[in-house]
Amino acid sequence: MHCVPLFCFLWFCHHLYYSQAVPIRKVQDDTKTLTKTIITRINDISHMYSISAKQRVTGLDFIPGLHPFQSLSDMDQTLAIYQQILSNLSSRNMVQISNDLENLRDLLHLLGSLKSCPFDEAGGLSALGNLEGVMEASLYSTEVVTLTRLQKSLYVMLQQLDLIHGC
């Protein structure tokens, strides 16, 4: 008689434990799919390849470089910086990629909330300040360097999404 409530409780706990794993996997898969979509969009922009990756462009130090991500929050902060830079570029392609980055950041936040991870505010945004002067002086170079670095960061992010099990 006492076993029935215990069995029901254990069944309920078992159901809760396994029901959470499915949404996390789905959100993670959606995150990877959107990341691949953004990479494909960047590949489709043909003018990106007209500047060598080895060529140095001065004055664009505000664009994040390639670095490993330690957490979902790191990914979000880097994407927030790229999103702000792209939103200042007027090309139609940049608007689409910026919107995709916003959706990707939303997925990262959802993934973080499912894993009970705290997210820091995107601190690098205030350091960007007013980009209009730099953008006017070298709009094309800014676009090319931003897309090149974003694409490399997305590849790293794609590889590390499976490796980040905690926050």
Swiss-Prot record:
Gene3D superfamilies, sorted: 1.20.1250.10
Keyword Signal included in the entry's annotation: yes
Listed GO MF terms: hormone activity; peptide hormone receptor binding
Gene Ontology CC: extracellular space
Pfam family, one: Leptin
Subcellular location: Secreted
Record-linked InterPro entries: 4_helix_cytokine-like_core, Leptin
Secreted is among the record's keywords: yes
Protein keywords: Disulfide bond, Obesity, Secreted, Signal
Predominant location: secreted
Disulfide bonds: C117-C167
Function text: Key player in the regulation of energy balance and body weight control. Once released into the circulation, has central and peripheral effects by binding LEPR, found in many tissues, which results in the activation of several major signaling pathways. In the hypothalamus, acts as an appetite-regulating factor that induces a decrease in food intake and an increase in energy consumption by inducing anorexinogenic factors and suppressing orexigenic neuropeptides, also regulates bone mass and secretion of hypothalamo-pituitary-adrenal hormones.
Protein name per the record: Leptin
Species this protein is from: Sminthopsis crassicaudata (Fat-tailed dunnart)
Record gene name: LEP
